[in-house]
């Protein structure tokens, strides 16, 4: 237990009997959420343990059972901490506007906008989600937008006002209009 308190990674090397100890596993996932991978199956189904794991590292959702990948609270927390956790959420929750908007609002780091690639296609038609991603991250979020926002003159002008290079992701019809960057 002391080793896990100092470093959650110690769970990876712990004897099997410790991998089923709720207190030890909880301590480990609070330090390193990805240690959920090493927990015994009954503990991987424990809501509190999985919640602690995804709060520490959203990527821990990968090791949660399907029943918890369908939990709004678990997925929302995972998405707050790591938008790419959306990849492991149930299809229903990848189509949940609140969760995808949370992902868009918390994008950070290189390649963060690719988290939107896991969202349901119909949400990539939502201008608020796409604009939030552009504001929080950068123009590359437009890659995942559907054709509708990319073809919306007002939307593209607003995006260009935030990042001039957003114009490169506008629809071909709008890119052919060389006056648009001047309008922004």
Segments and roles (model prediction):
Residues 1-184:
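Non-catalytic tandem-repeat scaffold regions and their flanking low-complexity/translocation tails
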């Amino acid at each position: 237990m002391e080793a896990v308190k100092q470093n959650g990674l110690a769970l990876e090397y712990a004897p099997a009997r410790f991998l089923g100890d709720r207190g030890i596993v909880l301590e480990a996932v609070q330090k390193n959420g990805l240690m959920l991978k090493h927990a015994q199956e009954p503990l991987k189904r424990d809501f509190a343990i999985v919640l602690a794991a995804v709060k520490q590292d959203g990527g821990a959702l990968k090791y949660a059972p399907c029943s918890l990948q369908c939990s709004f609270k678990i997925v929302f927390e995972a998405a707050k901490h790591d938008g790419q956790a959306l990849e492991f959420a149930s299809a229903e929750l990848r189509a949940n506007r609140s969760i995808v908007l949370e992902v868009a609002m918390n994008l950070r780091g290189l390649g963060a906008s690719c988290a939107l690639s896991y969202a349901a296609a119909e949400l990539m038609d939502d201008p608020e989600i796409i604009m939030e991603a552009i504001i929080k991250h950068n123009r590359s979020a437009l890659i995942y937008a559907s054709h509708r926002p990319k073809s919306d003159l007002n939307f593209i002008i607003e995006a260009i006002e935030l990042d001039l290079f957003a114009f490169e992701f506008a629809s071909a019809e709008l890119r052919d209009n060389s006056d648009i960057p001047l309008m922004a």
